[in-house]
Amino acid sequence: MKIGIFSESYDPVLNGVTVSILTLTKELKKMGHEVYAFAPRYPGYTDTENEVFRFPSVRTWAARDYPLAIPYLPKLIQRVNRLELDIIHTQTPFMMGWLGLRLARRLGIPIISTNHTQYAEYAHYFPLAPVEMTRTLIIGHLRRYYNRCDGVVVPSSPIAELLRDYGVRTPIHVIPTGNALDTSRDEEARSRIRQEHGIPADARVMLYVGRLAREKNLGLLLEAFDRLAHKHDDLYLFVVGGGPFEAECREIASGLECCKRVVFTGSVPREKVAKYYSAGDLFAFPSVTETQGLVVCEALGAGLPCVAVNAGGSPEMLVEGEDSLLAENDIEDFTAKIDLLLTDRELAQRFSIKAVENAARFSPHGMALRMLEVYTAGSHRS
């Protein structure tokens, strides 16, 4: 099968969308399928693979990290026609997504789209209009786009329900992104990373991995750590990742009494992120806007007991009472759930063992097999 992937987000930007695309692409190629990616050009970045086609792009004030594609390049569109694609799979419902839709209809082939993001929760990034007005416009846009597709893929059932509430009537398939990152425990990496950051070998480390953005609810994480650090004097917090909210997070942390026990790594290459999981003892995830929360799956693979806010798609990746505890989105409950795992070490150890077992559910190969079933269903529908 020849598959065309269209996305605003792609290498070199590191986020859940890019990781999902690369994971799927790798597995499909292993199975003998041809996969071609179409994405915006990123200044200063050169692709190492011939199957990636770049469109001209511009940077915008609303999303400085994500160049906006200008999906008009006649020669490139002619090249798409010559590829004789069997299906188009869009990953974003914006410029590249609409281009993929137009090309699919022109070529008479099916189009599938994956919804990776709760876009309406990002309305605050567009300050020129009231947030509720922006949310309404975004929801209408999503409904129009997805109802023109032959199938929609989401990583968790809460997101499927959300799209149905928006009025999406296209068949929706739930397929979590597979975890291709080897986060299995590495004692040498654990020791080295702790030494690099001046953390004692016998300290306990609360870990967060992900973008530092306002919608990640990081104020809750920092306030919870501040409370817990007074009770547990061996507790440190690792914040692994970068993003537009990083400076503000650092400023908040600098005002904490235990600020010297908060470590910000900034952006970290994905291969090194795997090692940071080994340095942790517990994974704390405050985000309420995740469609899946792939980092939660990665944390399970590292054997980390998890505490997550019971919202969005993250809870579906966990088995509460086996590998994790779910908390309400308030400081008292979130702090209490983390404190329970810090205090009851036997419970934390049981969760750690089950976490590794449960992580096996998120197989990249299984993800690709299920996606191929969706492609087939889309072919019949189109």
What spans do the regions from the language model cover?
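A conserved mid-protein helix/loop that constitutes part of the nucleotide-sugar donor-binding site
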Residues: 19, 204-227, 237, 244-250
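N-terminal subdomain of nucleotide-sugar transferases
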Residues: 1-56, 369-372, 376
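Conserved acidic donor-binding segment of nucleotide-sugar-dependent glycosyltransferases
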Residues: 320-332, 340-346
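Nucleotide-activated donor-binding/catalytic signature segment of Leloir-type glycosyltransferases, i.e.
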Residues: 250-268
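Aromatic "clamp/platform" in nucleotide-sugar-dependent glycosyltransferases that forms part
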Residues: 288
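Short hydrophobic beta-strand element within catalytic cores of glycosyltransferases
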Residues: 296, 305-308
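Short alpha-helical donor nucleotide-sugar binding micro-motif in glycosyltransferases
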Residues: 80, 145-146, 267-268, 275-280
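Donor nucleotide-sugar binding/catalytic pocket of nucleotide-sugar-dependent glycosyltransferases
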Residues: 39, 53-56, 132-135, 139-188
